[in-house]
Each structure stands twice: as structure tokens, then as C-alpha cells.
Amino acid sequence: MTTHLDSRRPSPVIDDVRTRRSALRLLGAGALMAGITPVAAIGQSNDDNVLSEAAVLRDPDIPVAGNAGGDITIVEYFDYQCPYCRKLEPELQQALKDDGKVRLVLKDWPILGPASVYASQLVLATKFQGKFVEAHTALIGLDVRLTEPGARERLANAGIDVDRAIRDLQANQEGITAVLKRNDDQAKAFGFNGTPAFIVGKFRVPGALTRQQFGQVIADARKAAKKKK
């Protein structure tokens, strides 16, 4: 699978989900904003559902960046080898700073090879030392080809205890693998074709945005959320 860049405006979620195909495109009946399991999404019910609010927005195994108490959530599906993910990172971070009220949920979706998988696993393991955001920032800022030794070196230079991260990865391999599986299931269920891909409030965004475009979709998501109240 290759990365996917789509500059089109995001597609809003509508309130009429009748088919599985609709669920692959949309969050389903405003489900995430309303906290209701999507009608036609994968899974059986409630929190076991791949596209439930709990699974997508509030996975307890994924630390939250940005404003943890924000009123709008951005979920980013990314790969550390994705050039578009790297390129848009400053745009996204500036948009978050501009707004100040956005939760950012970073979902590793390593689709570009073994180096991506290793990097994602290692970064997820850094949460046990409270360094997930710092580790993510270090690797998403790479401007060279990602390798396993390079990932370790980059993390060490960012102040991460890499030896501990490796031990934590080994001790929590099953749980970390499960996180990546959940992320993969969700991204595929949303119909994303590559990275970067986003859920912004109730909008599906299959591609990179500029700072201004992020600001616009955040504003649109906030307006849509208010209409639901």
C-alpha cells in the first residue's frame, strides 16, 4: 500500500447510514459525536465495535496529545515513513496551537514495511516512561530514511530511555500488537487508502491538510457538534 494525498475538502458525516459501504465511508448517524455505536460498522455492539466512540476516540492504551480536555477530537492515522505525514506535522501542530481546544489521538498505522512496524511498537512502548508524545515528535520529524537503528538513535537523542523502551516493548508485546491491530481495523473500516488520514470531530479526512484547512474543518466540526446538542 502506498501513501495517499487528497487535498479535497473532508466529507461530512450524515445521519442516514443504511449499508456497510456507508459505514466504511462515514462515522454513521453522527455516531461518534452522539456516543452511539455506528449502525452498519464492523463488530457486534457497544465498545466491542471497531468504530464505536470508545474504540476510536478514547482507546485507553493510546495517550492523548494536544488539549486532553478539548471539545473536538482529531484522530490521526499515520506511518513514520510516510513523507506526507512528516510534511504536514508542522501544519497540524500550528493548527492545534491556534485553536487550543483540540484533543489529538495519534494512531500508529504502520503500512509501509517492517521499519514502520518496529518504530510504531517502540514509540508505543515509551508511554510506560511517560514519553509517548516526545517519542512521536522525534520520529515524525525524521527527514531521512527510517531504519531500526536510526529510530533508536533518534529516540535516544530526544531524551528517551531506549533500553527501557525495548524492555517495555518485550514485556507488553501482546498489548502493543493489539493496539496496532485495532488501529488497522479502524482505518480499513473507515475506507482509508493510506496515510495520513484523519477523523476530525464528525468529519472523515482522507489526506493531508494545510494549517488553514485544519482550522476550517475544526471550526466545521465544532459547529456540527453544537447542532447536535
Predicted feature residues:
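N-terminal secretory signal peptides
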Residues: 1-22, 29-34
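C-terminal segment of classical bacterial N-terminal signal peptides
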Residues: 35-40
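N-terminal "domain-start" segment that seeds a small globular fold
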Residues: 44-64
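Short active-site neighborhood of thiol/selenol oxidoreductases, capturing the structured segment around
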Residues: 68-81
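Soluble periplasmic/extracytoplasmic beta-strand elements of cell-envelope proteins
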Residues: 73-76, 103-107, 197-199
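Conserved redox-active cysteine motifs that mediate thiol-disulfide chemistry
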Residues: 80-90
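Conserved helix-turn-beta segment immediately C-terminal to the redox Cys motif
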Residues: 89-108
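Cysteine-centric redox/oxidoreductase cores and disulfide-bonded domains
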Residues: 110-195, 199-228
